[in-house]
Amino acid sequence: MGQPSWQGDTLHLTIRVQPKAAQERVMGWQGEQLKVALNAPPVDGAANKALCHFLAKQLGIAKGQVTLVRGEKSREKQLVIQGISPSIWQQFLERHGV
């Protein structure tokens, strides 16, 4: 998928997940992927759920607005985030030093 792309108020992006991390945080860009560290293990979809919950909480949106569209069993996840503006996304990145 590559770089984040917008369709109206919907963001499409690729995230690289680091499961079983000591601290949940946004680690920065790794190429065209945003790297996110999560506490959850990569078992039974726990890391996928944790990723959607983490992003929703950090963006101040409902969990249902963050959808995993590809990468259920991979560290590389393609997500769709609905109902946010580019300015909210930019604030999120700045808040995490990205």
UniProtKB/Swiss-Prot annotation:
One GO CC term on file: cytoplasm
InterPro entries in the record: DUF167 (IPR003746), YggU-like_sf (IPR036591)
Domain of life assignment: Bacteria
Family: Belongs to the UPF0235 family.
NCBIfam families tied to this protein: DUF167 family protein
Protein's UniProt name: UPF0235 protein Mmc1_3654
Source organism of the structure: Magnetococcus marinus (strain ATCC BAA-1437 / JCM 17883 / MC-1)
